[in-house]
């Protein structure tokens, strides 16, 4: 089968199954528990005991495995570069940003998914991951694909706090909750998917305002539950991910300026909003982590970062494959994912994540502690 015929076939499958396909495959594979060595030196007398993560598929470490949703990736070739080559449910070839941050801070090599029923008590003591692929700041985003909304992720966090108190006592539990680093990664699904469904009610500017307001309310609620060190990822150039180029960029597969404009509007709104919120909430460190400029530069200048390909993913043809379309029987998957910025048509490779984290963590960590 030629590459062109295969792509046409995949596009038909994507359109035909977008709102109807639902899977219920699960994996409870045990993740690697190797401790990270740490490459970021913290200021004297500063401790970050754990990493606690909320958001979407950029950081989901396997929570969707345990949901009745089509948005899963707990099968090969996902995870091919993960320790042990395990498809854990991370939407990448390897680890995701929250794992890499934890390693760089010397906490652990990976941060587990909270919904994994095989978690042991000791797994909870270095932080957990509540993120659910397909979620977003807009409540409709998670509802459309039957995943864990951000509001329900907060409920899971409250449950987690109660478990900590039982395991280590109230004093140690409060210390972990207060001093852990919180990562919030959302907005991509809102912009790439839900914005179209909301376009009757919102334009590009008003929808960005709505998302920024929702993000601010989420951070305030997280603070109310005890979080103090909160890093919020900016929106990324959603219009430049391979799938957006294929579905919206016409024959030349250019970036979707419409989607990128919504992302820029959101970033312009959320930046002063979070800055004001940080001043309003006592003893808080609320910081916007600007991922957009770094990823955009990587996409425009891939060779400067050691990549060869930035407009296609490694999996399959790299044009539309994601989730079940990115599978081990796809004949076009690349052999060397480290040459690609994107693993599938939406999500970066671990190598790309490592570059982003290493470029940004050193700049932002002092603001967060």
Curated annotation (Swiss-Prot):
EC number(s) on record?
3.1.1.-
User: Main localisation, per the record?
Assistant: secreted
**Origin, by domain of life?**
Eukaryota
Pfam families in alphabetical order: Lipase_GDSL
Matching entries from InterPro entries are given as:
GDSL, GDSL_lipolytic_enzyme, SGNH_hydro_sf, SGNH_plant_lipase-like
Would you indicate the residue range of the signal peptide?
A: 1-16
Q: Which GO terms describe its cellular component?
A: extracellular region
Q: Which residues form a coiled coil?
A: none
**Glycosylation positions in this chain:** 28, 45, 203, 336
The Gene Ontology biological process terms listed for this entry are: lipid catabolic process
Localization in the cell: Secreted
Q: Which CDD domains match?
A: SGNH_plant_lipase_like (cd01837)
* GO function terms (MF aspect): hydrolase activity, acting on ester bonds
Keywords annotated in UniProt: Glycoprotein, Hydrolase, Lipid degradation, Lipid metabolism, Secreted, Signal
Catalytic center at which residues? 57, 344, 347
Q: Where are the transmembrane segments?
A: none
Which PANTHER family does the record match to this protein?
A: BNAC02G29810D PROTEIN (PTHR45642:SF134), GDSL ESTERASE/LIPASE EXL3 (PTHR45642)
Recorded family membership: Belongs to the 'GDSL' lipolytic enzyme family.
Name used for this protein in its record: GDSL esterase/lipase At5g42170
């Amino acid at each position: 089968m030629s590459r062109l015929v295969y792509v046409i076939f995949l596009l038909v499958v994507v359109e035909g199954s977008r709102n109807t396909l639902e899977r219920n495959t699960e994996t409870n594979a045990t993740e690697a528990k190797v401790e990270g060595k740490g490459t970021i030196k913290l200021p004297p007398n500063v401790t970050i005991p754990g990493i606690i993560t909320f958001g979407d598929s950029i950081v989901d470490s396997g929570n969707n495995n345990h949901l009745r949703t089509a948005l899963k990736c707990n099968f090969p070739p996902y995870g091919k570069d993960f320790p042990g080559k395990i498809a854990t449910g991370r939407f990448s070839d390897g680890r995701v940003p929250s794992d890499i941050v934890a390693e760089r801070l010397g906490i652990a090599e990976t941060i587990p998914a909270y919904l994994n029923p095989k978690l042991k008590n000791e797994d909870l003591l270095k932080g957990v991951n509540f993120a659910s692929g397909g979620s977003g700041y807009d409540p409709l985003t998670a509802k459309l694909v039957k995943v864990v909304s951000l509001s329900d992720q907060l409920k899971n966090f409250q449950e987690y706090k109660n478990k900590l108190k039982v395991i280590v006592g109230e004093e140690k539990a409060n210390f972990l909750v207060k001093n852990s680093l919180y990562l919030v990664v959302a907005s991509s699904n809102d912009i790439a998917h839900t914005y179209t469904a909301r376009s009757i009610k919102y334009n590009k500017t008003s929808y960005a305002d709505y998302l920024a307001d929702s993000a601010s309310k989420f951070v305030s609620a997280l603070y109310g539950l005890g979080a103090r060190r909160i890093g919020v990822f900016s929106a990324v150039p959603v219009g430049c991910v391979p799938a957006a180029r294929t579905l919206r960029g016409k024959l030349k597969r250019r970036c979707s300026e419409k989607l990128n404009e919504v992302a820029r509007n959101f970033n312009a709104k959320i930046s002063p909003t979070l800055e004001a919120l940080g001043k309003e909430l006592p003893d808080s460190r609320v910081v916007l982590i600007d991922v957009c400029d770094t990823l955009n530069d990587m996409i425009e200048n891939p060779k400067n970062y050691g990549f060869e390909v930035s407009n296609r993913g490694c999996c399959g043809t790299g044009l539309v494959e994601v989730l079940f379309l990115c599978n081990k029987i796809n004949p076009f998957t690349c052999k060397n994912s480290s040459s690609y910025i994107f693993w599938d048509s939406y999500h970066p490779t671990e190598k790309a994540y490592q570059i982003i984290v290493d470029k940004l963590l050193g700049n932002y960590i002092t603001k967060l502690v």
